Amino acid sequence: MKKSLFVSSAMALLAIASLASCGKNTQDADPNTIQIYAWESGLGLDWLKQTVADFNASQSEYTAVLETSTNASTIIKTLDLGTSNAYDLYFSSLGTFQYYDSFATLDDVLEYKNEGESKTIKEKFYPGFLDSERDPDDGKYRLLNYGNTVAGIVYNCDLVDEKDLPRTTDELSNLVLELGNKKITPWLFYNEPGGLNGYWNYVSSAWAAQYDGLDYYYNHLMTLKDDSGNTPSRAVFEKKDGRYKALKVMEDIITPNTTHSQCTSTNFTTVQNLYLKGQAALTVNGSWLLNENKSTANINMMKTPVISSIVEKLEDTKMTDEELSEIIKNIDDGKAYDADTYSCSLNDYNRIKEARTVIYNNSAEQYIFAPNYSNALDASKAFLKYFFKDSSILTYMNTLHLPSNVRLDNASLYDGSNDSKWSKTLFGMAENEGLMVRTSRSPVLRDHGVNAFAGVQTAQSFLAGNPSDRKNADQVWDELLAVIDEGWEAWTNE
């Protein structure tokens, strides 16, 4: 099996090399022609195709050429070719940071102010993105991102009334039971054999961050750094923290009785189409859902319910879930803290408020980068400056009716008055800094494609029809520990 995989990989690389030999490389290329390679994911690329056309029409010095693929791995494999690589600029996800040191710095793009605008590109970015992309060693930017997509729990508005939306995970559990009692299937999501668990990792990571707090999540868990500053710390990776608490929530709400039979399907298109036809009330997905399926289904995304076990981390550890929910309601209503309004301390209020704003934003993983050996680097930067100007951002927003990763310098250019409820919700969520993957995370995670759950199956473990195959949260956690035990030496000995 390993031999055949190697041969397949070698053949793929040979094919890419053949394509490169037919085109340009960094030694003989036209420095004024920008070869762009872009990943076509759920957002499509109509917006980028239009921006490329507009850029080419706007000036005569440079020419941008766009090539696309629905397979991010195919795109990234071109980086194996080094200076024989034909591409100058990428819009894609990255499985690992194997090639990161060969990416050019893009700080001068961020410091640029487009003509007629009052802010630099850097000043236009929504909160969190630049923090996630800043190099932890030298503070420079070798990665930027495109888009502004969040992932969370989606609900069918015809099956779940807005007044019944859960503010806590205990309330989410009650909602799942109530739906079942009404003969409505609560959950339908797809089975991804990779590390995302049918997008559930986005929600479970949010719950983990809610429980432990963002400081712990970013500065200890994701950096694998202990309280003494030692990193990588295996003890931190194995600590039974908010990740375990998230698994306990999932164990409660995901069962054979609460899930659609198609939850075992690995075909996300089939599952999403069934969901959008009303086959279940809830799913886990992201901003791209309606665009990817060309649907106008009556759905919306809820704020991620606050994990009820957060009370274990509060000063008031005896706070009831009803009290927690009421505090969250007041926060949602925009009520400022005072002792008469809130039945909790200021510290607990701040902790709960932070948790309420946590929703996973995966656009920080949709990267823009340029190889530093490209002789069209100046041209690529000229394109990026154009890409982040208001007219290009407006193209993105008008095409998708979703927020971009940067705000318009002139907000009045976009008319969202006729946007759907779905779009308006997602524009609202963009105002809060999302939970994001950062370049400062531990090389154990960053360079080996390992996530906070060590890549183990979570959601699928709880819904197996055969009782002998079904696992509980403790068994999934034991599997996580086993994966860490098996991989730790390879991850840390480089």
What do these predicted regions represent?
Residues 30-42, 62-67, 89, 142:
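Short, well-ordered beta-strand elements
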Residues 41-61:
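Short, polar/charged alpha-helical segment
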Residues 54, 58-125, 158-167, 274:
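Extracytoplasmic "Venus flytrap"/periplasmic binding protein-like
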Residues 94-151, 173, 324-353:
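Hinge/lid segment of periplasmic solute-binding proteins
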Residues 135-146, 151, 173-234:
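Extracytoplasmic/periplasmic solute-binding protein
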Residues 139, 295-403:
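Extracytoplasmic/periplasmic substrate-recognition and gating elements
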Residues 176-179, 218-265, 294-295, 304-310, ...:
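Glycine-centered hinge/linker elements that transmit conformational signals in sensory
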Residues 393-394, 406-494:
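Conserved C-terminal helix/tail region of periplasmic/extracytoplasmic solute-binding proteins
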